[in-house]
Amino acid sequence: MKLPFLNKNHSTSSYSSNSSSSSWPWPSCNQNPKTLSFRATITFTNPIHDQDDDELDLLDPPEITDSVENVIKGLRSSERLIFESKGETNSILEEATSKREEEDEEEGFMLFSLESDDPYSDFKRSMEEMVEAHALHHDWKSLEKLLLQFLKVNAKTSHRYIFAAFVDLLMNLALDTKKAIINNDISKDDGVSASRAAAAGEASTSCCNSMTLGESPSSPLSFYTSCSSSSSSDETSSMSVRFLPLSSLLEMDEKTKEILV
């Protein structure tokens, strides 16, 4: 027994299956499967890490390092690259100090360094020796140059001692100059006083010698005046002695009376 609707449905279903199979664009899974198996070992690589490794290899390859060392050895052997120090040591400060000492020796004095417990006294004594050796007592320009030299060759921590010693040196020089002037004036005053005293002694001697007792030729009695000498701090004056006979005094008295009458 045949049922028509069943046949119709069957044909419809077959048609639909054929149309669907023809319209499906993707192949089915059972046709030549090419899917990789998950059991296979998969290796993932990071391109960034690969780039870093390549850069490290390029930065420090053993061949380039060896070639650089060979170049340096070749330069040394051919005397193109000379590693020599011109001074005794490699210290720049020591070379500058030695150069400064040579310049100071050319200027006429020698520089030396020492450790001092009393820098003020040492600086002052050194300055006094320089002044005495070069006769700088009244030469202000040379004294100023001396101060600048001390400041130049010493550290700033020692400048206060240098200034103090220099000021005291100037004070001592000024006092010595003043004492010399005073002594010179005193010696001059002593010479003048001695000459004045000698003159006064001679005057007093002549005065005393002139005071003699004796008879006047005109009269048995004679009148004399005593000598008087007055001395001061500036001048010494002496009065000469004059002898007048008594008769002369009487004549002078009579003439005076006539004039008055």
Curated annotation (Swiss-Prot):
<dbReference type="InterPro" id="IPR038933">
    <property type="entry name" value="Ovate"/>
</dbReference>
<keyword id="KW-0804">Transcription</keyword>
<protein>
    <recommendedName>
        <fullName>Transcription repressor OFP15</fullName>
    </recommendedName>
</protein>
<dbReference type="GO" id="GO:0045892">
    <property type="term" value="P:negative regulation of DNA-templated transcription"/>
</dbReference>
<comment type="subunit">
    <text>Interacts with BLH1 and BLH3.</text>
</comment>
<feature type="domain" description="OVATE">
    <location>
        <begin position="112"/>
        <end position="172"/>
    </location>
</feature>
<keyword id="KW-0805">Transcription regulation</keyword>
<keyword id="KW-0539">Nucleus</keyword>
<feature type="compositionally biased region" description="Low complexity">
    <location>
        <begin position="11"/>
        <end position="28"/>
    </location>
</feature>
<dbReference type="GO" id="GO:0005634">
    <property type="term" value="C:nucleus"/>
</dbReference>
<comment type="function">
    <text>Transcriptional repressor that regulates multiple aspects of plant growth and development through the regulation of BEL1-LIKE (BLH) and KNOX TALE (KNAT) homeodomain transcription factors.</text>
</comment>
<dbReference type="InterPro" id="IPR006458">
    <property type="entry name" value="Ovate_C"/>
</dbReference>
<keyword id="KW-0678">Repressor</keyword>
<dbReference type="Pfam" id="PF04844">
    <property type="entry name" value="Ovate"/>
</dbReference>
<feature type="region of interest" description="Disordered">
    <location>
        <begin position="1"/>
        <end position="28"/>
    </location>
</feature>
